[in-house]
């Protein structure tokens, strides 16, 4: 008797040659979290792409927490439906800030991946990182930020103070286009 697989077969969006890509949408989601963000996202990339297409989005931005884990599946599924994937992630810093981070080119994509790897491999004090933990501070983010569009996210509680304490209160980030 053959063994049944322990995991179900992965679902995919079936390509359709008659499919017309959505027109330019006035609004698209940029901070979508997939099921690859443990205890945060519940939706499989297939479901997110199907929902984006159904809502008429011409693009969708994936932003898993300190991870690029969902981007490959989102990219493949989105292309099948004519939805442009905006590839990035949500960077959460040790200072308590969160940024949507979207690389502008291949080199910036590499820097973003190296930033995440650095945060996952070594703690800020130089010791090896515990599994599943990612420590990225603003200085580390600034060192890898060239060519990456960063959007600072407000706190969940808008009554919270939206500032951080820093030694000099200034963390230099590279300017766009300069």
Sequence positions of predicted segments:
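Phosphodiester-processing cores and adjacent nucleic acid-binding clamps
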Residues: 1-178
